[in-house]
Amino acid sequence: MRINLASVLVDDQDKALRFYTEILGFQTKHDVPMGQFRWITVVSPEDPDGTELVLEPDEHPAAKPFKDALSSDGIPFTAFAVDNVQAEFDRLQALGVRFTQEPTEMGPVTTAVLDDTCGNLIQIQQAGSQPASEGSGG
């Protein structure tokens, strides 16, 4: 058994698709009209046949209060792996992405948290013992 799909709840599918592809660098895998909304998935360009992220409309009545509660408490909705948190932080910040947490070492990982502009906080994380600022170890 393996994970095939994961979802992130978004308040605007077009805006989310632009952010997740043009800013974060994912690739569109599916964009299928389904009535009022679309079935949109994005994938990592490094693993186009891997896990797909569904840009799911947050229209269910429970979705917005759930997202608001997570966001107001500073809790990321999901996390993405990166090779170097500091480099991604610098790249994304230069593109205007707002971060709620700068790169921070948390035990064996370094993390940062960004706002995806669609109602979610997203954590980026770098595994291993290499501090984001020192570039040593591994």
Predicted regions and their residues:
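Conserved active-site tyrosine of GNAT-family acetyltransferases
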Residues: 16-21, 92, 119
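Conserved catalytic-loop position in the HRD/HxD motif
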Residues: 84
